[in-house]
């Protein structure tokens, strides 16, 4: 540092930089050793050199804006210039150790004893019920409510979460760690970020399991309050892998009011009985009537499907399963997904937006525990 003859207080500059988080790691630049140099001119002009984890870091512009804004607020600063350099291999190794410790193999933090992250696997028995739309809107609503949220697009074959969240950036990799892109205040990972164009993914079960394991263990999620997983429809390999990798994950079952949809949704929820997972609740999407030109109500998908699923799963599992909410039909829910802008952010007071915010609030406030979990054991009498 070269303070020169100036009234600018270097301690205040360092304090200002301590408020700037790395956009991917979500921790202060000063804590991560990413401030290489601070040069203060007598005129009050300040140059800050920031160390990037990789040369092609996609967050360069964000860092420039955030550092400039923080330093410009210090008394006496007349101008701010942000320069960049790249970490050495040794510095990246130290960063990895700081974030992950000295463990030789990555571990899934959400599966470790003492993890306070609430994990919800969003499932449906069949496609076309709006499961992915529900997932991204719940995630965006929770983030808007102040929670730290991550989303795993676990629908490897039918990935759609990046588009629905408007994510086009590819993840940055640092010493074997994957830094998930961020959008709307949440972190997200998807196989779609690693495939060229709209290329299909043609994998067998073991490859699916490995991909999910990497998304959970190799991605640096930081300290999450909630992790949401958008599962593929049905009860196949991915559902089994999630139960193995994240035994504490709770199932969210999405259905429509339609009879055929809720019958299939019951099968998806009944998987919890075999995997000893808890069912967090049922969400009925595409709910409520629409009206014709004469004002007559039309139940496009019938009614009562969500409650029927909740009641059936309660009987099957022997636990309390509640209908968390009913999300009205709203074309803007689909339009928001196409545009990468969740409805809960654009119109949180709309019928669908308000319903999703209410469901998100219920899930975000739930305490973790063993209530409702089938432990897979049989009590025996004491001898």
Name what the model sees in each region.
Residues 2-36:
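N-proximal, solvent-exposed amphipathic alpha-helical segments enriched in charged/polar residues
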Residues 24-51, 327:
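Short edge beta-strands and adjacent turn/loop segments
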Residues 118-156, 269:
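Walker A/P-loop phosphate-binding motif and the immediately C-terminal alpha-helix
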Residues 339-349:
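C-terminal boundary of histidine-terminating zinc-finger modules
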């Amino acid at each position: 540092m070269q303070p020169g003859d100036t009234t600018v207080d270097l301690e205040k500059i360092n304090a200002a930089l301590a408020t700037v988080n790395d956009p991917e790691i979500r921790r202060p630049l000063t804590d991560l050793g990413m401030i290489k140099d601070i040069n203060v001119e007598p005129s009050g002009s300040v140059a800050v050199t920031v160390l990037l984890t990789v040369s092609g870091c996609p967050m360069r512009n964000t860092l420039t804006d955030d550092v400039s804004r923080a330093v410009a607020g210090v008394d006496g600063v007349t101008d701010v210039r942000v320069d960049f350099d790249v970490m050495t291999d040794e510095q990246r190794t130290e960063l990895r150790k700081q974030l992950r410790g000295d463990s030789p193999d990555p571990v899934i933090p959400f599966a470790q004893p003492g993890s306070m992250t609430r994990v919800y696997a969003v499932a449906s028995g069949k496609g076309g019920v709006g499961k992915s739309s529900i997932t991204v809107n719940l995630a965006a609503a929770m983030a808007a409510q102040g929670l730290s949220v991550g989303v795993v697009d676990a629908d490897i074959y039918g990935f759609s979460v990046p588009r629905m969240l408007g994510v086009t950036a590819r993840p940055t990799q640092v010493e074997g760690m994957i830094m998930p892109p961020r959008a709307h205040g949440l972190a997200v990972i998807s196989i779609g970020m690693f495939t060229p164009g709209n290329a299909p993914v043609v994998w067998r079960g073991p490859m699916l399991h490995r991909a999910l394991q990497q998304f959970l263990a190799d991605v640096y999620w930081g300290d999450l309050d909630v992790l949401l997983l958008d599962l593929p429809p049905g009860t196949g390999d991915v559902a089994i892998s999630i139960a193995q990798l994240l035994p504490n994950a709770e199932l969210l079952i999405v259905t429509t009011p339609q009879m055929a949809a809720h019958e299939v949704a019951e099968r998806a929820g009944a998987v919890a009985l075999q995997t000893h997972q808890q069912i967090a609740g049922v969400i009925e999407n595409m709910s409520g009537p629409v009206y014709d030109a004469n004002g007559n109500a039309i139940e496009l998908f019938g009614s009562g499907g969500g409650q029927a699923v909740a009641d059936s799963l309660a009987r099957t599992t022997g636990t309390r399963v509640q209908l968390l909410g009913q999300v009205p039909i709203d074309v803007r829910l689909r339009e928001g997904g196409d545009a990468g802008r969740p409805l809960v952010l654009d119109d949180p007071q709309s019928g669908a937006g308000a319903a999703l915010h209410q469901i998100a609030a219920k899930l975000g406030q739930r305490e973790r525990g063993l209530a409702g979990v089938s432990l897979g054991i049989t009590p025996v009498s004491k001898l």
